[in-house]
Amino acid sequence: MTDLHQTYYRQVKNPNPVFTPREGAGTLKFCEKLMEKAVGFTSRFDFAIHVAHARSRGLRRRMPPVLRRRAIDALLQGLCFHYDPLANRVQCSITTLAIECGLATESAAGKLSITRATRALTFLSELGLITYQTEYDPLIGCYIPTDITFTSALFAALDVSEEAVAAARRSRVVWENKQRKKQGLDTLGMDELIAKAWRFVRERFRSYQTELKSRGIKRARARRDADRERQDIVTLVKRQLTREIAEGRFTANREAVKREVERRVKERMILSRNRNYSRLATASP
């Protein structure tokens, strides 16, 4: 029956997903033990018990189909690999998880779909094994990395004691403070380090996403500049810079303004003429 499923049951592009971390990536010994214990989790009695409880509460109506269970098994490997025992948080975006777990698909138009991963996460959340919360940030115009944490029910299902989890957390506190001492910084308590770890993920993502947004704006502008003459681009740059000066976003003397005009015109000419505005096209030499 398994052979038939693997041969014919192909309602998805990758019916047998496998977690494959990026080349050179490593993880903690504690996370490696979690990954070992999570192998084949959906075929165990513990998983069936959690599904039965979800059915009794009206959250689910049946055991998930075989393709969903395979997705959950692959996703659990990725979750355990990227788990941070100090912050009790999976330090990885859903998109990266979906790609590494073989649960992402890309259309002919280049749009990425991670529906299989999000559905598997939602299912684990309904079982009470993880917490899964999304949050939209209007400042950067997209969702920030999802907060995924492990619950005590998951550790119990994986036969991992609370003492082992606490020991892994203390070990990370010691390691973090050693790194701070090397940098000449004061040591911090566990609560402060946990708060710092949560802030770091969001702040790094916001700065990275802001940079990506800036690149995207430049690429879109380069597409429009492709058919424009140099003098047209000069006029547009001067108009833009005049507006920024009036709004107080650019403050400098006359010579600095001239240099900025030359810099922006040169940048826009290179991007538009060499077709560097495309993420897929190879830059011209």
Swiss-Prot record:
Source domain of life: Bacteria
Keyword annotations from UniProtKB, A to Z: DNA replication, Plasmid, Plasmid copy control
GO biological process: DNA replication; plasmid maintenance
Keyword Transmembrane assigned: no
Matches recorded under Pfam families: IncFII_repA (PF02387)
Signal peptide: none
Keyword set includes Nucleotide-binding: no
Family from the record: Belongs to the IncFII RepA family.
Protein task: This protein is essential for plasmid replication; it is involved in copy control functions.
Name of the protein this chain belongs to: Replication initiation protein
Record organism: Escherichia coli
Name of the gene this protein is made from: repA
